């Protein structure tokens, strides 16, 4: 499902070069769960962002769900990400101007799923995470744990092949 080969990530400024990842090789097969642990600043989020195609490595190759993504244009990567990957971000990244239901529907909107089907799927997944009674609430009206469940609902609503979670 995910195969990283020789992944390196170097952040450069005028004065300093920081090696975040060095020669990372990783393979995660269908049905496997992987937990990446380590101290703050060791590259966990950088690795997750590269695995999730949100950031590009300095060098190395990435294969997701049998597709080599090296060389894909930004628009292709965005469409691929939306079809194959679900994300639960450490800071949730909920849109405060949208209610819970609309936040969960968002990935389906990008996939051009009909409004009726988006609503049905979002309501179904909110029921599963125990938040159907909060559908019309805004993210600022929720607890941290509830926001986390909204983020999980948004990640799984499109039934992605792969779910990536940063400190879920």
Where are these regions (language model features)?
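ABC family nucleotide-binding domain
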Residues: 1-168
